[in-house]
């Protein structure tokens, strides 16, 4: 079953006080222009569920989409885009950081990286920051179609090697993904679906004395 199929827009939020009361959430984040909106549209089989723009930094709020299992997917503002006023950028940073740090409903993070330029400084900082929450991270190496098959294999291997210190301390997984070629949809579904399954199992299990 495609977990993301038939996802529906729910609401958009610009302040933490306006966050909706939801069951469980998984969030999508990435550098501006890493292909986050295209990845969301591909996973949900929607043409324009998430706004795709040639202008980096277009996603400026926290957007909520309801999944068919009743839980939520959250599209967070992209990071690393400097061509906005300082006050706006500071607001994005605070909004993003406070949501990731304090949102109790959040069970995992999908981090989008351009397969041609993975693990940039801000991506590493995001991994370090999110590590403190103890929640899993799944990395989509987007735009994989821009690489040859050999380059894809080499890139995935290199990224896994570089992530080894992080995967030793927290649950981190990584895969290749292409919105253009519809590559990696099933793998992303399985990984994120397992997060919801684990959260449901933990919630239904009796507390130990």
Swiss-Prot record:
GO terms for biological process: division septum assembly. Gene3D superfamilies: P-loop containing nucleotide triphosphate hydrolases. Its cofactor is Mg(2+). One of its GO terms (molecular function) is GTP binding. Residues 22-198 form the EngB-type G domain. Mg(2+) binds at residues 37, 59. The keyword Coiled coil does not apply. The keyword Magnesium applies. It holds the Pfam family MMR_HSR1. It comes from the Bacteria. Keywords: Cell cycle, Cell division, GTP-binding, Magnesium, Metal-binding, Nucleotide-binding, Septation. One of its GO terms (cellular component) is cytosol. Belongs to the TRAFAC class TrmE-Era-EngA-EngB-Septin-like GTPase superfamily. EngB GTPase family. NCBIfam families: GTPase_YsxC. Necessary for normal cell division and for the maintenance of normal septation. This is Probable GTP-binding protein EngB. It comes from Neisseria gonorrhoeae (strain NCCP11945). The gene is engB.
């Amino acid at each position: 079953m495609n977990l993301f199929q038939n996802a529906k827009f729910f609401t958009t939020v610009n302040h933490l006080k306006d966050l909706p009361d939801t069951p469980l959430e998984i969030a999508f984040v990435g550098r501006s222009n890493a292909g986050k909106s295209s990845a969301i549209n591909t996973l949900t089989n929607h043409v324009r569920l998430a706004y795709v723009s040639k202008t980096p930094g277009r996603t400026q709020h926290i957007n909520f989409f309801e999944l068919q299992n009743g839980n939520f997917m959250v599209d967070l503002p992209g990071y690393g885009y400097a061509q906005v006023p300082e006050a706006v950028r500071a607001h994005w940073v605070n909004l993003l950081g406070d949501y990731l740090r304090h949102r109790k409903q959040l069970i995992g993070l999908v981090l989008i990286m351009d397969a041609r330029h993975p693990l940039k400084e801000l991506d590493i900082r995001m991994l370090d920051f999110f590590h403190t929450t103890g929640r899993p991270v799944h990395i989509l190496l987007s735009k994989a179609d821009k690489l040859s098959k050999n380059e894809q294999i080499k890139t995935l291997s290199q990224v896994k090697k570089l992530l080894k210190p992080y995967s030793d301390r927290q649950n981190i997984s990584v895969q290749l993904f292409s919105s253009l070629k519809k590559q990696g949809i099933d793998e992303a579904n399985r990984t994120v679906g397992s997060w919801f399954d684990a959260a449901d199992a933990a919630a239904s299990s009796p507390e130990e004395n």
